[in-house]
Amino acid sequence: MSAPRPWEFYEADYHFLEDAERPNLPRIWRVLRRLEPLAGTSFLDLGSGVGWAARLALRRGGARVAVALDFARRPLDLGRRQTPEARWVRGDGTTLPFATATFDRVLAFGSIEHFPNLPQGLAELFRILRSGGMAAVVVPNFYVRTEQPLEFRATRREWERILRAAGFEIAGVGTDSGPAIFKNRRPVRILLRLGLRVASLVPPLRYQFVFVLRRP
């Protein structure tokens, strides 16, 4: 039996359902704050899942409009019920259905590394961001592994090279220590998250990097 195609993987059993039911909002907000000011901006939650970032951008950040885009239907349906004031769009991150220079702020939290064509996805991110606009991308360190069918991983230096090659200025770099250790009750996953948290005490081994990008 062949492996499921990426969209089939997410549609058949949306494995982030626990994120919809028990979101780690402080973790998302820590990243969103790197894009402040959000008030009055047009905001895109790229690879949104159920769109908690779009919700926070609107309700806490004061964004004028927030769009949540994902290529799987199920998370969009879940998110639409929770945050009806956001715009919900089903689309592909490598061919974004938006005009050039549409958004002031973009968040891609754990999404661009799953694009089938990373350079094309970054070119699209650059295209839809306004001049002077900012994006925060949260991407995995070189050793991180998940069960998702497509996943690009790199060191911090490699990520910096890739992002600059796409035309972005790097305005800041931070780290993300990953999901809460007791996010769920699966013993193996708890042990893995505990190990990741310990590894993250060593700066080069932080779980994920947070790059704040600016379009010149």
Q: Where are the language model's segments positioned?
A:
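Conserved class I S-adenosyl-L-methionine
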Residues: 1-36, 41-49, 195
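Class I SAM-dependent methyltransferase SAM/SAH-binding core
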Residues: 50-95
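A conserved beta-strand element that flanks and buttresses the S-adenosyl-L-methionine
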Residues: 107
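A short glycine-rich, Lys/Arg-flanked "PGG" loop and its adjoining helix->strand segment in the class I
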Residues: 119-131
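Conserved beta-strand signature within the Rossmann-like core of class I S-adenosyl-L-methionine
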Residues: 133-139
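A C-terminal cap/extension of S-adenosyl-L-methionine-dependent methyltransferases
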Residues: 136, 157, 161, 171-216
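Acceptor-substrate binding/catalytic loop of class I
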Residues: 143-158
